[in-house]
């Protein structure tokens, strides 16, 4: 196995089919997990053991954060779901990670995504932080392609 340097996690882009194309400052939720079912059995020798078997597969929601701008793309997409149009709002998309030379080095593709939550900044009169907006995306499937 060739030695590879770990990837830097701050160069990434988001491409959601026809809705969002841009850069975010933070991304989480690129994974899945199985519920664990404990199955109690008795062996031929009378010993009780607990076998753990995979249960229902669950995909984590993708959470994206970025500095707020005048761009309304995530809010317009969320409004589509709020108005009852979740089927029309479903989109496929990708999270793309780049190396320091901006060459694509990793890609996660997800399917049938829709915005389950959208929130804006929490302004404070005495603060000087950049306002952050957050988008949470539910989806049917995600796979690391590269």
Show which residues each predicted segment covers.
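Glycine-rich, low-complexity intrinsically disordered segments
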Residues: 1-146
